[in-house]
Amino acid sequence: MKTQLAILLITLVLFQMFSQSDAILGEIWKGIKDILGKRGLNDLSDLDELFDGEISKADLDFLREIM
């Protein structure tokens, strides 16, 4: 019984540490974004160009073959 209680307490402490570290890291990231501003983070929008939402005829043919 003592071992189970110890494991439960250790687990609760670890979960609490994880949730607090997530909040701290979020605030640090928010501060970094505020320091850099929108001009510094404009390069991150270039990742949107990697995804092409259009489906080509070859893609449709391949999907039909699979079905």
From Swiss-Prot:
Tissues of expression: Expressed by the venom gland.
Secretion signal span: 1-23
Residues with Leucine amide modification: 36
Keywords: Amidation, Antimicrobial, Cleavage on pair of basic residues, Membrane, Secreted, Signal, Target cell membrane, Target membrane
Coiled-coil regions listed: none
Propeptide boundaries: 40-67
Subcellular location: Secreted; Target cell membrane
Main localization category: secreted
Single GO cellular component term: membrane
Superkingdom assignment: Eukaryota
Keyword Membrane: yes
Family: Belongs to the non-disulfide-bridged peptide (NDBP) superfamily. Short antimicrobial peptide (group 4) family.
Function summary: Alpha-helical and amphipathic peptide with weak antimicrobial activities against both Gram-positive (MIC=41 uM to >82 uM) and Gram-negative (MIC>82 uM) bacteria. It has extremely weak hemolytic activity against human erythrocytes.
Domain characteristics, as noted in the entry: Amphipathic and cationic peptide with an alpha-helical structure.
Protein name: Spiniferin
Organism: Heterometrus spinifer (Asia giant forest scorpion)
